[in-house]
Design a protein with these regions (language model features):
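C-terminal and inter-domain tail/linker signature
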Residues: 1-122
């Protein structure tokens, strides 16, 4: 439910993807989430460890997905879907304000991500 996802973000939130791309504002973060949703199907998040302190939550997770859609590239080109399923590890750090995401940073090993989905040699 994209409305529910949108409402998780504060209007002025900042999101940073593993490649360092910064998304500013609710609409930009929702658009990024939708991009990932169209690129990968069968997302399954296994939260291995969650730690909270004050207004910050850190989530260590394993993510399994199948690459069924194109991966858009910064230059406007795209990588075709591989159809491969892969499990990778990621870490998300979330700062909250009034129950909404104020800042979100996601870290993952993109080299193993790209190799696992068959985008580059392993």
């Amino acid at each position: 439910d994209w409305d529910a996802v949108s409402n998780m973000y504060a209007e002025d939130c900042v999101g940073i993807d593993p490649d360092g791309t910064k998304y500013e504002g609710r609409a930009a973060n929702l658009e990024n989430d939708q991009k990932w949703g169209s690129m990968m199907s069968d997302f399954n998040f296994n939260n291995a460890n969650t730690v909270e302190s004050g207004n910050t939550t850190v989530v260590e997770m394993e993510v399994t997905a199948t690459m069924t859609g194109e991966m858009p590239m910064p230059d406007g080109s795209s990588i075709p879907p591989s159809g491969k399923t892969h499990t990778f590890k990621a870490c998300m750090i979330i700062d909250w304000n009034n129950g909404q995401i104020k800042k979100q940073r996601i870290y993952a090993d993109f080299m193993s991500f790209m190799a696992g989905f068959g985008i580059m040699p392993s």
